[in-house]
Design a protein with these regions (language model features):
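A short alpha-helical cap/connector motif
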Residues: 1-150, 154-170, 180-226
Length: 226
């Protein structure tokens, strides 16, 4: 009940930030209107919906957010995604289904049998457990560099951001999971928005998006996605 009331309060606060109102950049308006707010029933939504209950006891986003991650990957078309903090693995599946030509490397401190079950059906997903920094170093030595980074269900979000931001270029997108989860993370998210190393940022409440195209004027977009 507390979360429901909080979301209602934040929805009211973000009311004027809905549907791209006040956004003058054509590319940002397109992104908000046709990626964030797209309502078409994509082909993968139905089978993925039935997988959710298998891993519902593990950390996960709302289904609405996972559908957005599907659309985001479908829009960006990266060849490599790195995800730190697998959680339930359901977001991993949504992203993998959006672009069958890419490889997803998802890093988790420990292995979960239920997560293995829902990820094993996709050869494009590597579920890496244990020392994630060692796995990252190994991938980088092989020339495997992420175009999308999902900092998801991990308490080491600050460390992972600093570890991975040197890999970012104008084509990179960072997805920050649950930026309002705690007061400390909320303060850190504000620092990320103001960081001179980052470019355009989007705040959807459940997730934040960070882009790094320094040719564009740095702006922050709040989107009512509650």
């Amino acid at each position: 009940m507390g979360d429901f009331i909080l979301r209602g309060w934040n929805w009211c606060r973000r009311f004027r930030h809905r549907c791209g109102y006040g956004v003058h950049s054509p590319s940002d308006f397109f992104f908000i209107t046709f990626v964030i707010y797209e309502r078409l029933p994509f082909y993968a939504y139905a089978p993925l919906h039935h997988l959710r209950r298998v891993v519902a006891f593990l950390p996960h986003y709302r289904e609405k957010v996972d559908k957005f991650l599907f659309r985001l990957i479908n829009h960006l078309r990266p060849s490599v995604v790195w995800e730190v903090g697998t959680g339930s693995g359901i977001s991993t599946r949504y992203m993998a289904e959006a672009n069958t030509g890419m490889q997803v490397y998802t890093f988790s401190e420990q292995s979960e049998d239920a997560v293995k079950r829902i990820l094993s059906g996709k050869s494009s997903i590597d579920y890496l457990t244990g020392n994630c920094e060692a796995d990252m170093d190994r991938l980088l030595k092989k020339g495997v560099k992420p175009e999308v980074v999902h900092i998801a269900h991990t308490p080491a979000y600050k460390e992972m951001f600093e570890r991975l931001i040197p890999l970012a270029d104008k084509h990179t997108c960072f997805i920050i999971g649950n930026p309002y989860a705690t007061p400390e993370k909320k303060r850190w998210w504000k620092e990320v928005i103001a960081d001179p190393r980052t470019g355009i940022t989007f705040d959807l409440y459940d997730v934040g998006l960070v882009f790094f195209d320094k040719e564009r004027v740095k702006e922050h977009r709040i989107v009512n996605f509650l």
